[in-house]
Amino acid sequence: MDAPGAARKRGVNGVACSHLDQIEIVDLPESIAGCEDCLATGGRWVHLRMCMSCGKIGCCDSSPNRHARRHAGSEGHAIARSAEPGEDWSWCFVDEVAFVVG
């Protein structure tokens, strides 16, 4: 049996995320204009993600520029959450595991 609270630290496939200590921001901003980098360059996006370390809004891996993944790699911020309405899952780019915080 897992210790209390262990379930929220495990991904949907049972793999634990080892970067939970990087989570600083959980809640989405009240309004999101779009992917910050796409807005600056005139790019387009499919879905949005929010870095849970610094709050930067980037586009998903289905988007042409994959700015959320690029940000994770360049800044070392491993975890992003979905910024889509009604979604509360997060993703660790390093451990490649999805999970829900809370």
Language-model-detected regions and their locations in the chain:
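Canonical RING-type zinc finger of E3 ubiquitin-protein ligases
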Residues: G43-M52
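Cys/His-rich, Zn2+-coordinating zinc-finger modules
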Residues: N13-I23, P29-G34, T41, I57-G102
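Extended, low-complexity, charged intrinsically disordered regions
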Residues: M1-R8
